[in-house]
Design a protein with these regions (language model features):
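A short, compositionally biased
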Residues: 134-136, 181-182
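N-terminal beta1-alpha1 cap of cysteine-dependent amidohydrolase-like domains
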Residues: 1-98, 102-112, 117-120, 126-134, ...
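C-terminal and late-domain segments of enzyme folds
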Residues: 142-275
């Protein structure tokens, strides 16, 4: 990609990933430039990462979810791109993973990076407690103490989840304590009636049984971020499942609320990475 004075987003595709087009569209709405590139081509020419500010790891069913959701995709990232991705992160750039992308980041050790150590086994995203594929819209709220740059300005957001393995789990209570004490939990599932975090087993508000209602986490810098809900599925107000009622009541938002997540990343690049 020819360098321009705009935020540039690299979106890997292929091998069963399937949310790249709407992800690219969301960033384009916000004025960013995007490239959709097959993951094999990125591994073959990893120097291309130097041309981008944001790496967007999208959702889908990479490799048919064989072994575990995102596991094979994670191995590509870990063994095919470990050093280039390490430089990308150390250069102050951004990574966002959504659903399958989040699963891959966790299983590759990119997240949660406790104490800034990118190692595997510190958390996982495993089978939903419900035992079924969850496809529903849910309420989420931010952890306002988090350093996550992707969730700034968000009060509450309504987004869809689409996954069979979204339960945030940890190898020990100590790993969970370290994550929470560092305020690396970025988003929680919300019970809209009680206005409290939807901790397990508050189903379906917590759609997968995630420990302590965890819906998204970031690394200690706040720049590297993974979330189970799909921000890119709410780009237009007409994506909302109740848009007709909201329009009748005069409550239809001007834009899809998922855009705020991507906007935060784009604005961070403008403020910190563009000369």
């Amino acid at each position: 990609m020819a360098r321009t004075n705009k935020p540039r987003v690299l979106i890997p595709s292929g091998q069963g990933l399937n949310c790249e087009e709407e992800t690219a569209f969301g960033y384009k709405i916000l004025g960013a430039e995007t490239s959709i590139v097959h993951i094999n081509d990125i591994i073959a020419k990893p120097a291309m990462l130097e041309d981008y500010h944001i790496l967007a790891l999208v959702g889908g069913f990479s490799d048919g979810d064989h072994i575990a959701s995102g596991k094979i995709h994670a191995n590509r990232l870990r063994y095919g791109l470990e050093r280039p991705l390490g430089r990308f992160i150390d250069d102050g750039k951004l990574i966002i993973g959504v659903c399958n992308g989040f699963q891959a980041m966790v299983k590759a050790g990119i997240l949660p990076a406790l104490d800034n150590k990118r190692e595997t086994g510190m958390m996982t995203l495993t089978y939903n407690d419900s035992g079924i594929f969850e496809d529903r819209w849910i309420h989420i709220i931010p952890n306002k103490k988090s350093k996550c740059i992707w969730t700034k300005g968000i009060e509450e957001i309504y987004l869809p989840v689409r996954h069979g393995e979204g339960k945030a789990s940890f190898p020990s209570d100590e790993a969970l304590r370290r994550l929470e004490s560092a305020n690396q939990v970025a988003l929680y599932y919300l019970n809209p009636e009680t206005r409290k975090i939807a901790k397990e087993p508050d189903y379906p508000n917590n759609p997968n049984g995630s420990i302590n209602g965890i819906a998204a986490v970031c690394d200690p810098t706040g720049r590297i971020f993974g979330m189970m809900p799909h921000w890119e599925a709410f780009l237009s107000p007409y994506n909302h499942p109740n848009w007709t009622r909201l329009k009748t009541e005069g409550k239809l938002p001007k834009e899809g609320l998922g855009l705020q997540v991507a906007r935060n990343g784009v604005e961070y690049v403008k403020d910190n990475l563009l000369g």
